[in-house]
């Protein structure tokens, strides 16, 4: 039988299905309702509440192949990936589980039977470990399985006792290991199970016997219904069955390495030289599955871990000479290998590729500068005789150039240095403290401490503004500057708290109301309303007339025309959200919004600019809902009922047990606390103004409605009229006239290119006269005239053809930058010459970077004055390359 990775997974699930287990699909890598976990990292994660007794399932036996990621948090294998034969950030955990059904006897029997009868592993090579005092498990291995006592080892709590946490279910475990042979023996004096961790003794399967409950005092009492939790790494067991020395040599990972070989034009080696290949092969699996499960690159949380993984892989791609986005090209290989078992990665393949490519492009923008800065930092440390890169410098790389700490550590390690992690963390905390201090400033008048005190004294403000825009109330507090006062006269800037108010306080992206507060002869002109300390509606304004006093009876009047304009834009925002999902896909989620009387701004998850067709379809969908005059219904219900009805809950928002639902016909339904229209027809018209990228995987749309939309159309009409006047054509002919002018410009540019090409040919004869010979190889290294990289490459091709055999190193100044090209003929590449390394060496001198293939490469620099030095540096390296 051929044991492909997919076949092993299938055999495992089918075997346990035959033993009465229900095959349960892998849970998402993003744990559901478990804030203690960054990612799913074991098969039992999705059954945690079942083991704890909080959840009932319709089965007592289950089997899974669980997607797992261990990178970040308590379980972090990132640093060891690629260095060992068996560590990964992404892996699959095969597992079988019993929830109070069978226990040790069947768990051990099933595992042994699967490994020996189904997989055919040699019984005389298998070992078992048990917990020190687990006599029951020891006896089962010896008497039921027939394993010699010499191959059953008792180990301590560190190796053979498992606990879900400091308290709760726990119990001993039993591991199954295989002896892979004397040839893999390590150099330790005593190479044995429990004594070393070498590749000879490979742990295959861990059987956890949950039989105790540990309380706060550490006392363990037997569970009434003991359970089983087992885990076996698919990659590990497949490596054993395929008789290969490393997980990376299995058919689960080797095709990924082969594809990287094609990308970089280098051959993979199983020793340290293959380290970058293994990192990339592992990391592309993590990236593919994390993005499929909804994780997007960001600067915090899960998104930051994803960004670290992806950027680390890109960095090792550069080590292999890949100086362009490439990770996204490997995604289809992952899908081909794993799409049958995990169809969702096939469904989201295009989406995943887009996310990865965009993130790669963003990283490349900063990587060149960052690598140069990092090299300078390392050189300075070495020059001063040090061996530690200061934490502040590592933080600069992180904060300014987007280098994760582990990337700085990799760079340092390659240069024989370490990173001051404590200093890095101190710099990070200092930045956080600055951010906290900034949040605590008094931009809103009084400091947060005063608002917290007032909230405690007065209680939260009652908001009455959903159904009306005016109402009577009582002044509960007046603040001027940062001090509570009892009264304030004309001209004084104040912040006023009322017992109840119709003024909406800024929240959920909707800005606060403005209007008037009238108390007899005193008037406060309210310019803004904000929610402070989580419960106070604070009216920011100026006393326009009279003396305003605490305890006054007031009439609060919201500026109703402004409120209506805000409501137009807020209701249109809901329609926009729905339209984006319809046109672009369900991956679209709101990431932020701003609703003002003048316009709306909507941030959403998407990974490419809108096409003109998408733009038009989104705008049409919004206006279709407007013209359909859909009723806007607002009601309160429970959070569970709202979700059951299909209401959209915004990611990252916190909701109580009771929520407010805004429904617009059968088109849109969202949880929202803002103010809205009564009917979508009141929007009038919606026009999109702009769409742009604001971050990795985030886009922003701005739009206007109602009177603002009319004003926008009038402006556009006036612009067209002025253009028509300047171009001396009717308005309807403006685009045709512009097309004609552009065509004329392109023709002039083409003529210019032809002229430059002829000039280049004249240069070639002069350049060839300057060729020289180095170690028997014809070499032409020269400064040339070429306006851009395309022209320089064209010149290189012509010169290479003329040379027949040899090496070219050309440099040209283009504005304030330097373009560099290196090329070598096939026969010279065979003598050890690598154009990519030559051009990289030259670029360093000019303050730039680049690289490429052995036969052709290009680079750029920032210092034209160093071009001659750069060419000499490349020639010097060339001398050492030629064999």
Swiss-Prot record:
Q: Name one GO cellular component term.
A: cytosol
Give its localization: Cytoplasm
Q: Does the keyword Protein biosynthesis apply?
A: yes
Name of one Pfam family that matches: DHHA1
What lineage does the source organism belong to? Bacteria, Bacillati, Bacillota, Clostridia, Eubacteriales
Cofactor binding notes: Binds 1 zinc ion per subunit.
Keywords (alphabetical) are:
Aminoacyl-tRNA synthetase, ATP-binding, Cytoplasm, Ligase, Metal-binding, Nucleotide-binding, Protein biosynthesis, RNA-binding, tRNA-binding, Zinc
What the entry says about domains is:
Consists of three domains; the N-terminal catalytic domain, the editing domain and the C-terminal C-Ala domain. The editing domain removes incorrectly charged amino acids, while the C-Ala domain, along with tRNA(Ala), serves as a bridge to cooperatively bring together the editing and aminoacylation centers thus stimulating deacylation of misacylated tRNAs.
Swiss-Prot/TrEMBL cofactor(s)? Zn(2+)
EC number(s) reported in the record: 6.1.1.7
Q: Provide the protein name.
A: Alanine--tRNA ligase
The UniProt entry's sequence similarity note says: Belongs to the class-II aminoacyl-tRNA synthetase family.
């Amino acid at each position: 039988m051929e044991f492909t990775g997919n076949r092993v997974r299938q055999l495992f699930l089918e075997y346990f299905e035959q033993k009465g287990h229900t095959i349960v699909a892998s849970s998402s890598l993003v744990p559901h309702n478990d804030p203690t976990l960054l990612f799913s990292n074991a098969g039992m994660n999705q059954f945690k509440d079942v083991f704890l007794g909080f959840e009932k399932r319709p089965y007592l036996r289950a089997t899974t192949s669980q997607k797992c990621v261990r990178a970040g948090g308590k379980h972090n294998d990132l640093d060891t990936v690629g260095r060992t034969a068996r560590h990964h950030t992404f892996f699959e955990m095969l597992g079988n589980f019993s929830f109070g059904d069978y226990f040790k006897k069947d768990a051990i029997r099933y595992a042994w039977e699967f490994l020996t009868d189904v997989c055919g592993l040699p019984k005389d090579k298998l070992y078992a470990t048990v917990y020190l005092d687990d006599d029951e498990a020891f006896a089962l291995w010896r008497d039921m399985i027939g394993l010699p006592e010499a191959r059953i080892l008792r180990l301590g709590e560190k190796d053979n006792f498992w606990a879900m946490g400091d308290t709760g279910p726990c119990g001993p475990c039993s591991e199954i290991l295989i002896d892979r042979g004397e040839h893999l023996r390590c150099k330790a004096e005593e190479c044995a199970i429990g004594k070393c961790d070498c590749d000879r003794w490979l742990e295959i399967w861990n059987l956890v016997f949950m039989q105790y409950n540990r309380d706060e005092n550490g006392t363990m009492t037997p569970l009434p219904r003991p359970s089983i939790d087992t885990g076996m790494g698919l990659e590990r067991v497949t490596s054993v069955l395929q008789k290969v020395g490393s997980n990376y040599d299995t058919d689960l990972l080797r095709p990924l390495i082969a594809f990287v070989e094609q990308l970089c034009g280098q051959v993979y080696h199983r020793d340290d030289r293959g380290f970058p290949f293994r990192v990339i092969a592992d990391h592309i699996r993590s990236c593919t599955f994390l993005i499929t499960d909804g994780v997007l690159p960001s600067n915090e949380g899960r998104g930051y871990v994803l960004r670290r993984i992806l950027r680390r892989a890109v960095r090792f791609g550069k080590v292999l000479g890949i100086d362009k986005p490439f990770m996204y090209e490997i995604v289809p290989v992952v899908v081909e290998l794993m799409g049958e078992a995990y169809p969702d990665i096939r469904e989201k393949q295009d989406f995943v590729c887009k996310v990865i490519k965009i993130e790669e492009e963003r990283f490349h923008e900063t990587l060149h500068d960052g690598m140069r800065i990092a090299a300078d930092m390392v050189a300075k440390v070495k020059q001063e005789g040090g061996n530690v890169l200061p934490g502040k410098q590592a933080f600069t790389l992180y904060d300014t150039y987007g280098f994760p700490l582990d990337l700085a550590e990799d760079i340092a390690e390659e240069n024989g240095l370490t990173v001051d992690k404590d200093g890095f963390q101190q710099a990070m905390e200092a930045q956080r403290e600055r951010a906290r201090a900034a949040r605590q400033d008094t931009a809103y008048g009084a400091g947060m401490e005063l608002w917290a005190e007032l909230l405690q004294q007065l209680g939260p403000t009652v908001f009455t503004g959903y159904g009306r825009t005016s109402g009577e109330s009582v002044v509960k507090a007046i603040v001027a500057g940062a001090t509570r006062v009892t009264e304030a006269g004309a001209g004084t800037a104040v912040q006023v708290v009322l017992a109840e108010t119709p003024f909406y306080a800024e929240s959920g992206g909707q800005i606060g109301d403005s209007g008037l507060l009238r108390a007899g002869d005193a008037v406060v002109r309210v310019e803004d309303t904000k929610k402070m300390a989580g419960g106070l509606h604070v009216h920011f304004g100026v006393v326009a007339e009279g003396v305003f006093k605490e305890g006054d009876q007031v009439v609060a009047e919201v500026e109703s025309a402004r409120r209506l304009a805000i409501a137009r834009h807020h209701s249109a925002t809901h329609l926009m959200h729905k339209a984006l999902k319809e046109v672009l896909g369900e991956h679209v989620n709101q990431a932020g919004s701003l609703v003002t009387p003048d316009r709306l701004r909507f941030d959403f998850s998407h990974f490419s600019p809108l096409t003109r067709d998408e733009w038009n379809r989104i705008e049409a969908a919004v206006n279709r809902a407007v013209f359909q005059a859909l009723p806007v219904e607002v009601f309160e219900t429970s959070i569970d009922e709202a979700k059951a009805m299909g209401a959209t809950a915004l990611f990252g928002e916190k909701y109580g047990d009771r929520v407010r639902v805004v429904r617009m016909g059968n088109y849109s339904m969202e949880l929202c606390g803002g103010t809205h229209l009564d009917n979508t027809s009141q929007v009038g018209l919606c026009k999109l103004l702009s769409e742009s990228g604001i971050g990795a995987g985030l886009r922003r749309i701005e739009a206007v409605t109602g009177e603002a939309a009319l004003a926008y159309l009038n402006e556009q009409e006036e612009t067209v009229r002025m253009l028509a006047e300047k171009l001396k054509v009717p308005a309807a002919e403006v685009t045709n006239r512009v097309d004609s002018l552009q065509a004329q410009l392109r023709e002039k540019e083409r003529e210019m290119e032809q002229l430059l090409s002829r000039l280049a040919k004249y240069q070639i004869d002069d350049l060839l006269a300057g060729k020289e010979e180095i170690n028997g190889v014809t070499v032409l290294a020269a400064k040339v005239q070429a306006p851009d990289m395309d022209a320089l490459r064209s010149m290189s091709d012509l010169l290479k053809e003329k040379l027949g055999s040899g090496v070219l190193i050309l440099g040209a100044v283009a504005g304030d930058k330097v373009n560099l090209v290196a090329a070598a003929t096939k026969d010279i590449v065979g003598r050890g010459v690598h154009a990519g390394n030559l051009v990289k060496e030259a670029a360093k001198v000019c303050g730039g970077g680049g690289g490429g293939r052995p036969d052709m490469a290009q680079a750029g620099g920032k210092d034209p004055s160093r071009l001659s030095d750069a060419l000499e540096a490349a020639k010097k390296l060339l001398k050492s390359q030629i064999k």
